[in-house]
């Protein structure tokens, strides 16, 4: 099972086991603080109208990341154990956004992008199982903002459709193996640029990682920013 088909247990709210379709674990980045912005003032992407990430022609701004991050916190149940360190949470969330753009591009190529109706049907099933408020809490415990649920479902469904297109009737392992090279290919074709304050893009492993020169904002800095 590839990283775009995440299932499992999440802590909090009674550690309910969730099998939410094939939810992509998506953790949105915490907005960089003024001190970090000053530190990285000369970096190229940060000059592109406040972009946190640019993937092809798509972009997400730092303010959009901040809004999604805050909405995740607001949706967490009272007994939640939290989402981990800001650095870990933010990086994984940003990576999920990158995946959503890449998977959508592959879906367009193969003519199998999940439709609004398919996304709505998948969400309706989840809301029937967990209730509307319950789904928001389950998603938040996976660091998925309420506004990002449909995006996450579309990515998950499109990934599934592409997998079936590439290896009809194949096992999950066979389909994941077929999609892996496509993810790398399309990531390179689109181009992924991460604002250095958040890290850098590893094109071979298709992950967001620390900058080799240490320019990405440290966990301590993010914690200090939260006050």
Where are the predicted features?
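N-terminal targeting/tethering segments
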Residues: 45-144
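Hydrophobic transmembrane alpha-helix bundles
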Residues: 116-127, 149-162, 207-225
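Alpha-helical structural motif
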Residues: 32, 61, 122, 158, ...
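Solvent-exposed, amphipathic alpha-helical "stalk/arm" or coiled-coil-like segments used as scaffolds
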Residues: 86-109, 128-199
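Short, low-structural-confidence N-terminal segments
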Residues: 1-86, 184-227
């Amino acid at each position: 099972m590839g990283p775009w088909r995440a299932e499992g247990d999440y802590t909090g709210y009674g550690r309910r086991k969730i099998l939410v379709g094939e939810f992509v674990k998506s953790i949105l980045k915490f907005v960089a603080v003024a001190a970090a912005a000053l530190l990285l003032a000369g970096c190229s992407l940060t000059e592109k109208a406040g972009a946190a990430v640019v993937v092809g022609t798509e972009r997400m701004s730092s303010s959009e990341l901040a809004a999604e991050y805050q909405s995740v916190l607001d949706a967490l149940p009272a007994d939640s154990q939290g989402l981990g360190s800001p650095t870990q949470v933010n990086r994984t969330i940003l990576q999920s956004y990158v995946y959503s753009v890449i998977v959508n591009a592959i879906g367009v190529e193969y003519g199998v992008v999940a439709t609004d109706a398919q996304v709505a049907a998948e969400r309706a099933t989840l809301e029937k199982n967990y209730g509307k408020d319950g789904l928001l809490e389950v998603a938040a415990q996976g660091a998925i903002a309420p506004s990002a649920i449909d995006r996450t479902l579309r990515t998950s469904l499109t990934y599934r459709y592409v997998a079936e297109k590439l290896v009809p009737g194949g096992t999950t392992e066979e389909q994941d193996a077929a999609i892996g090279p496509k993810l790398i290919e399309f990531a390179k074709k689109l181009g992924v640029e991460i604002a250095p304050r958040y890290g850098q893009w590893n094109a071979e492993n298709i992950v967001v990682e620390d900058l080799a020169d240490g320019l990405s904002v440290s966990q301590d800095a993010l914690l200090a920013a939260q006050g």
